[in-house]
């Protein structure tokens, strides 16, 4: 009886591990405003950050989402190390790097940028939204990202623009790179909303559609 029970438990454990290995994972890193103002904060121009709605959108597509509202004043590099450890743990259990995506919005997207540099995984996915400008590129010039990188920015946004310079200067292994320019007229506020205009491409990227 004990042997049968042990065999059953081992089978259940194997099924559980196999199930976890076949799931796709998204690390979602919200913007700085939410870190400072909290879930109920209302930006005077852009309104509320639709954090829960973004999480829900990824979950509805079958992703396991790993995310939290960070404490105000969180050290970005240390947080990137935390995300790296979590991603390493998933890979150690047998999850393919290509099934893991790190999505970062606004200036906090450079946490994702740092993770891309720390991981050195050419098959891991990264989505950088509204981050790149002369200042952020200069401040993070020593970070050499690898992986499949999707950059999304808004034409009317003065904070985040093209990340092409990052791709061109990186000595890391960038397997796939794509950039999308939106033109919503919402300036930096476009990334406060759970908009299909950026969520749609991000979801496709996280599913391995790099076209």
Regions found by a protein language model. Give the residues of each.
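Sec-dependent N-terminal signal peptides
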Residues: 4-13
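Boundary at the C-terminal end of the N-terminal hydrophobic targeting segment
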Residues: 18-20
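Short, surface-exposed "cap/lid" segments of acyl-processing enzymes
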Residues: 22-57
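Alpha/beta-hydrolase active-site loop
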Residues: 50-52, 73-94
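Conserved alpha/beta-hydrolase
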Residues: 55-73
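Gly/Ala-rich beta-loop-alpha elbow adjacent to hydrolase catalytic centers
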Residues: 103-112
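The feature captures the conserved acid-bearing segment of alpha/beta-hydrolase catalytic domains
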Residues: 125-188
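C-terminal catalytic histidine-bearing segment of alpha/beta-hydrolase fold enzymes
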Residues: 177-211
């Amino acid at each position: 009886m004990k042997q049968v029970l042990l065999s059953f438990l081992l089978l259940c454990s194997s099924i559980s591990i196999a199930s976890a290995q076949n799931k796709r994972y998204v690390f979602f890193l919200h913007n700085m405003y939410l870190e400072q103002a909290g879930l109920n904060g209302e930006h005077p121009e852009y309104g509320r950050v639709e954090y829960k709605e973004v999480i829900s959108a990824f979950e509805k597509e079958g992703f396991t989402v790993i995310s939290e509202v960070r404490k105000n004043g969180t050290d970005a590099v240390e947080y990137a190390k935390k995300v790296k450890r979590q991603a390493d743990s998933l890979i150690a259990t047998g999850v393919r790097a290509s099934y893991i995506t790190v999505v970062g919005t606004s200036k906090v997207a450079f946490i994702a940028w740092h993770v891309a540099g720390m991981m050195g995984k050419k098959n891991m996915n990264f989505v950088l939204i509204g981050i790149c400008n002369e200042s952020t590129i200069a401040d993070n010039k020593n970070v050499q990202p690898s992986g499949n990188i999707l950059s999304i920015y808004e034409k009317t946004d003065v904070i985040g623009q093209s990340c092409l310079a990052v791709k061109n200067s990186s000595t890391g292994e960038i397997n796939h790179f794509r950039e999308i320019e939106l033109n919503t007229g919402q300036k930096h506020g476009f990334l406060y909303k759970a908009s299909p205009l950026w969520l749609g491409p991000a979801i496709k990227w996280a599913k391995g559609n790099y076209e």
